[in-house]
């Protein structure tokens, strides 16, 4: 088992990475002994893993469970209320713990519920998708969607620990694995050119779910994320770089309907649009754009936006993006493989050119 620490003073917490961790009763006992715990999962993950995690936790905690419908379209205030209702009906107190068993949707909703319930209770992330293991479970971003924008209602609220059981990836559908790889590739583009090159050389190993390759990639991403969050927890500076591709990507998700495109698929297309924007601004060379496109395609990810989306469909959502300041759209753009920056002077005319060329 590998362990990575997110350094946030008295709110620091560990990320555990390994196989069969969901059966590790001693690991759960560190956080749940003599406590009441509510497991939040969905109707896809629960049949696969709920029973074993209940067995691991039952030796140390009193357990209740709430099962949500699976999908991004259910990440809303209505379904968040299911969690609150369960907590209230079973008299959960401030010393209780929420346990998120699922992908990014379950993790985001559980974390937000923990932040809100009785003004804050503890929660643990047990991410089951590649995307949630390498990105959304780490760093304390919690939220639900609104029809007018993704993740618009939420809070920064850190978990007590993140428990990554890599065995879960054996049951992950191929398109969900690919979606997670979009976030993995992102780390190479914004932060680590050597890691990007390693990804280019290990496509087959990763797609065939080779344990050593997966463990290395997951640990590398978690370490980068932990380092970034330690520097900038609430996204006032360097953490914004983790949003590469997300301004375009969130527009795709909102316009197409949440869940029609997986988050990682939208981030993939959005990352390519960001790279093409950087090329138009003479910030990024053509070879780097091509490398980004090839690597996304190697993992069966889309590199173009939906045909039905033109400039007007993009821009109405981009103007509502959380990174907008002073009425200006701020974009994370790569300047070379391994480096990126935030730009607030990208004109809508140039964005129109980029989107129209896709």
UniProtKB/Swiss-Prot annotation:
Location of the protein in the cell: Cytoplasm
Residues that coordinate or bind NAD(+): 70-75, 104-108, 128-129, 141, 150, 168-171
Pathway as given in its UniProt record: Metabolic intermediate biosynthesis; chorismate biosynthesis; chorismate from D-erythrose 4-phosphate and phosphoenolpyruvate: step 2/7
Co-factor: note: Binds 1 divalent metal cation per subunit. Can use either Co(2+) or Zn(2+).
SUPFAM superfamilies the record matches: Dehydroquinate synthase-like
Names of the cofactor(s): Co(2+); Zn(2+); NAD(+)
Keywords: Amino-acid biosynthesis, Aromatic amino acid biosynthesis, Cobalt, Cytoplasm, Lyase, Metal-binding, NAD, Nucleotide-binding, Zinc
Superkingdom in the source lineage: Bacteria
Family according to the record: Belongs to the sugar phosphate cyclases superfamily. Dehydroquinate synthase family.
Function: Catalyzes the conversion of 3-deoxy-D-arabino-heptulosonate 7-phosphate (DAHP) to dehydroquinate (DHQ).
Name of the protein in question: 3-dehydroquinate synthase
